[in-house]
From Swiss-Prot:
Residues 84-99 have a biased composition (Basic and acidic residues). Residues 112-122 have a biased composition (Acidic residues). It comes from Neurospora crassa (strain ATCC 24698 / 74-OR23-1A / CBS 708.71 / DSM 1257 / FGSC 987). TPR repeats lie at residues 136-169, 171-202, 204-236, 302-336, 340-373, 375-407, 408-441, 443-475, 476-509, 517-550, 551-584. The gene is tom70. Forms part of the preprotein translocase complex of the outer mitochondrial membrane (TOM complex) which consists of at least 8 different proteins (tom5, tom6, tom7, tom20, tom22, tom37, tom40 and tom70). Belongs to the Tom70 family. It comes from the Eukaryota. It is found in: Mitochondrion outer membrane. Its main location: mitochondrion. This is Mitochondrial import receptor subunit tom70. One of its GO terms (biological process) is protein insertion into mitochondrial inner membrane. Receptor that accelerates the import of all mitochondrial precursor proteins. Seems to act in conjunction with mom19. Residues 1-38 are mitochondrial intermembrane.
């Protein structure tokens, strides 16, 4: 997948398109296997095995082997068997137990429940084994008729008597169906659980219990049952597979809302913050806030000066301290002509922490105090876009142009608006306009190359990046994003060479605040090219040592572990990804992965014999 926008705008949960962060192309490649192997993620039979078509093939082949075994039948017998099999195929998914329902002895043939003796716990002990079986079968038959007539309470009574005669998983499941029709969900759970104790692989009972759990909002339990059903049934029931996907989404969305209600605001990783801040051209400090000017830290101006100094360190600690300083500066006040800048900066960090209302208020206040500060319009435009208000975003860009039509940042960020909307030709025009106004800003060149690539102009894109490498040969971002384009074309060797160059330049030019994205890109390249899990893991570990808060490094590590069948270890990283999620959308994704992985572990614990069989079918690169 082609790389997207290098310097990120701040993501905000919304139903509309959101600005894609610098590392979104990495995320695309990390999670690309999900769309290609949906059964692996959503039915969680195990990433350590091939669970897409291989799972189905296994079950279908096993069924055909069973049919072909035994003595050869006559033509008449084969025709009779074929008719019987056709009848069975028309029924809903059933367990082998139900298919092998007891035969009714002729001596017990009756037409109604009135012809049967009174059945209760005391009377049943006086019946012989054969009588109990025969009466149970007849009671089940009568229960089926009552169910078909929608006389569910009568059917429940008949199935209950059948169970007294002979505890059978089919009878429990059928009684559960009656409770299901009456929306008596707890009773459905009780009866299907009893059925599954007798036959753990009873697919119909699993599906019924899963549906009841769903109705009771016990989504994790429902997910586990539907997942087990999919695996046992060989992924032949599309409704169950869809239910798994739906439940994962429902569970994650509900859980995300709960978490966000109590989750304290927090800055994202230093990599993310740094990429966002560098999407604006650097400018010298305003007059009166230079280091040469002595200001007391007990004053608002002193705190504003201190905050700017912290930002220049380009470290996680620096960003945290800078954010605190901007807040304190406004609390202390007396900022004079720099008050608009203070609101701009505090609003920026509110935005990065996901405090969107506060951010919009601060940016609007900054504009009110200094309408000529175009950066405040740009930041508010980005937020409006991500909050689903593209008209307001366009209005802010137009207002910024009215203030200063020669500000190249306006066109760079407006190009991102076009890029997100898929208006690549318009995006390319604005990136070029940004370059024409200031050709020294590397990201305008990089993003122009990316846009050309998205438009299908591969030759133009490659030429743009070659010019970048010539004119910005000491800028690691050029090699990193060019490497992404090469990786997208499966030019693995060349891509890795570019990532290595980017890594070396990061170490050389920014030893204290290295961008870890080239490390992660190289890890993914080695994984895709050689399935070199060991080296890929080591690179991710290095990235996490440098930037422990880097969500993309965490997500990549989780996927690498999952691909190797290291499910328990992968779960820890998926849970960590949820902790690092900045927006509701990111949190829902992380929770979905975590819950899918957690369910896989439970399935393997509950059905060890099934997991063993499936692992025997493992195949494909890197799967063990």
């Amino acid at each position: 997948m082609a790389p997207t926008i290098p310097p990120p705008s701040v993501p905000i949960p919304a139903a509309t398109p959101v600005t894609v962060p610098a590392d979104s192309s990495i995320w695309d490649r990390v999670s690309n296997w999900v769309s290609e192997h949906k059964a692996v993620v959503y039915t969680i039979a195990g990433v350590s095995v091939v669970i897409t078509t291989a799972g189905v093939v296994y079950y279908l082949r096993k069924g055909s082997e069973q049919k072909e075994s035994g003595p050869k039948l006559s033509k008449k017998e084969r025709r009779k068997r074929k008719q019987a099999e056709k009848g069975e195929a028309e029924k809903a998914s059933t367990s082998k137990t139900e298919e092998a329902a007891p035969t009714q002895p002729k001596a017990a043939a009756v037409e109604s429940a009135d012809e049967l003796p009174e059945i209760d716990e005391e009377s049943v002990v006086r019946l012989s084994e054969d009588e109990r079986k025969a009466y149970a079968a007849k009671l089940k038959e009568l229960g089926n008729k009552a169910y078909g007539s929608k006389d569910f309470n009568k059917a429940i009574d008949l199935y209950s008597k059948a169970i007294i005669c002979k505890p059978d998983p089919v009878y429990y499941s059928n009684r559960a169906a009656c409770h299901n029709a009456l929306a008596q969900w707890e009773q459905v759970v009780a009866d299907t659980t009893a059925a599954l104790k007798l036959d753990p692989h009873y697919v119909k009972a699993l599906n019924r219990r899963a549906n009841a759990y769903d109705q009771l909002s016990r989504y994790s339990d429902a997910l586990l049952d539907f997942t087990a059903s999919c695996i046992i049934d060989g992924f032949r029931n599309e409704q169950s597979a869809q239910a798994v996907e739906r439940l994962l989404k429902k569970f994650a969305e509900n859980k995300a809302k709960e978490i966000l209600e109590t989750k304290p605001p927090k800055l994202p990783s230093s990599t993310f913050v740094g990429n966002y801040l560098q999407s604006f051209r650097s400018k010298p400090r305003p007059e009166g806030l230079e280091d040469s000017v002595e200001l007391s830290e007990e004053t608002g101006l002193g705190q504003l000066q201190l905050g700017l100094k912290h930002l220049e360190s380009k470290t996680g600690t620096g960003y945290e301290e800078g954010s605190a300083a901007f807040k304190k500066a406004l609390d202390l006040g007396e900022l004079g002509p720099h008050e608009a800048l203070a609101y701009n900066l505090r609003g920026t960090f509110h935005c990065l922490m996901g405090k969107h209302e506060e951010a919009l208020a601060d940016l609007s206040k900054s504009i009110e105090l200094d309408p000529a500060m175009t950066q405040s319009y740009i930041k508010r435009a980005s937020m409006n876009l991500e909050l689903g208000h593209p008209d307001k975003a366009e209005e802010d860009f137009n207002k910024a142009i009215e203030q200063n039509a020669e500000d190249p940042d306006i066109y760079y960020h407006r190009a991102q608006l076009h890029f997100i909307k898929g208006e690549f030709a318009e995006a390319a025009k604005d990136y070029q306009k940004s370059i024409d106004l200031d050709s020294d800003f590397i990201f305008s060149h990089i993003q122009l190359g990316v846009t050309q690539y998205k438009m299908g102009s591969i030759a133009s894109s490659m030429a743009t990046f070659r010019r970048c490498m010539k004119n910005f040969d000491q800028t690691p971002d050029v090699y990193n994003y060019y490497g992404e384009l090469l990786l997208d074309q499966n030019k693995f060797q060349e891509a890795i060479e570019k990532f290595d160059t980017a890594i070396a330049l990061e170490k050389e030019t920014k030893p204290m605040c290295m961008n870890v994205l080239p490390l992660i890109n190289k890890a993914l390249a080695l994984f895709q090219w050689k399935q070199d899990y060991a080296e890929a893991e080591q690179l991710c570990e290095k990235a996490l040592i440098i930037d422990p808060e880097c969500d993309i490094a965490v997500a990549t590590m989780a996927q690498l572990l999952l691909q190797q069948g290291k499910v328990v270890e992968a779960l820890k990283f998926f849970e960590r990804a949820a902790e690092l999620a900045r927006t509701e959308g990111e949190l829902v994704n992380a929770l979905s992965y975590a819950e899918a992985t957690r369910t896989q572990i439970q399935v393997q614990e509950n059905y060890p014999e099934l997991a063993s069989k499936l692992q025997g079918m493992s195949g494909g690169p890197g799967m063990r």
